[in-house]
A protein has these predicted regions:
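Sec-dependent bacterial lipoprotein signal peptides
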Residues: 1-19
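Extracytoplasmic metal-acquisition and chelation regions
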Residues: 6, 20-338
Length: 338
């Protein structure tokens, strides 16, 4: 009897043990299945996120800026709604630029294109419009940012012919016009994001307005006899005319004859007649002609350069249009108030 009971107990124990093992195996299989399912979900989520990011990039307006200052304003107003491709890099003449294959592709695919005008990019027969025509771009997408600016002219020393001065953007008030016109163009092309462009433009325009007022105050405080800016090229005409300055330079129109003996002689005569206190050299020109003027006139070149055609590379001291305007007023005020 006792043996029978022992056998029954052993049998029951064995059944229970086998049942427990079966449950553990089922749980492990379920866990493994859940893990595989979750891993699959994670892979799908990663794939979806990548696709979404690609879609977001694809949704951005593809924008062309012809040179560094315009491209910087595009970034300020367009923000994360745009992808900008700058054509003329820092250190390159925007008048005679030769587009690269990448430039041509970007122009072909662009949603909107901004250029300065006033012949900075070579005019209607210049490199920019040849590229537009070659790409088959719709000219309704192409916007000049100087439509509201009255052109000023320079006389070529050799030919005595008048040419438009394209350096409008050195004047902060022209910067305001450019930003306003760019905002309006973005809204015309992308009306769904009107509020976004309005908000960013308003903030940027407030900063430009404050800079304009700073120019009025600080340049106004400079003694009248010092209100003469002498530079290598006559690029500062629009800004100086607005704030009541006289301009003199070595060459008026950029040619291969820059810094000729006759040009240097005429500028030295002007310096002596007007008791010019300081000379300036632009950041992107050959300093030797002005060094000759300084040596022969006895007037020093200011220790810091002044900016005209471009902003610096990212990370440099003057790598945005706002910094460019602030830098120039600091240099002029420091040099001419002494």
């Amino acid at each position: 009897m006792r043996n029978t009971v022992k056998v029954m107990i052993l049998a029951i124990f064995t059944v229970l043990l086998l049942a427990a093992c079966g449950n553990d195996n089922n749980n492990n299989e379920a866990t493994n299945n859940n893990t595989e399912t979750n891993n699959g979900d994670n892979e799908n989520n990663t794939s979806d996120n990548t696709a979404n990011q690609s879609d977001e990039d694809g949704d951005k307006l593809q924008v062309i800026g012809t040179f560094t200052i315009i491209s910087d304003i595009v970034r300020e107003i367009g923000g994360d709604k745009v992808e900008v491709h700058n054509l003329v890099p820092t250190g390159t003449d925007p008048h005679e630029y030769e587009p690269l294959p990448e430039d041509n592709k970007k122009v072909t695919d662009a949603d909107i294109l901004f250029y300065n005008g006033m012949n900075l990019e070579g005019g209607e027969d210049g490199w920019f419009f040849r590229m537009i025509d070659s790409a088959g771009q719709d000219e309704d997408k192409v916007y000049s940012l100087t439509e509201r600016v009255d052109p000023m002219y320079l006389t070529d020393d050799e030919t005595q012919e008048e040419e438009i001065n394209p350096h409008t953007f050195i004047d902060p008030m022209v910067g305001i016009y450019m930003a306003e016109d760019m905002r309006d163009a973005f809204i015309e092309i992308d009306p769904d994001n009107e509020a976004y462009y309005e908000e960013r433009a308003d903030e940027y325009l407030d900063r430009l307005q404050a800079i304009h007022e700073d120019y009025e105050k600080r340049l106004g405080d400079i003694p009248e006899e010092n209100k003469i800016l002498v530079t290598s090229e006559c690029a500062f005409q629009y800004m100086l005319d607005r704030y009541g300055f006289e301009e003199a330079c070595i060459w008026k129109v950029d040619t291969e004859e820059n810094g000729s003996p006759q040009q240097i002689k005429e500028l030295i005569s002007f310096i002596e007649d007007n008791n010019v206190p300081t000379l300036f050299v632009e950041s992107n020109v050959d300093t030797r002609p002005m060094e000759t003027v300084s040596a022969e006139s006895g007037v020093d070149i200011y220790e810091k350069p002044i900016y005209s055609d471009e902003i610096g590379e990212p990370g440099e001291e003057v790598d945005t249009y706002i910094k460019y305007l602030n830098y120039n007023i600091d240099v002029m005020s420091e040099a001419l108030s002494e």
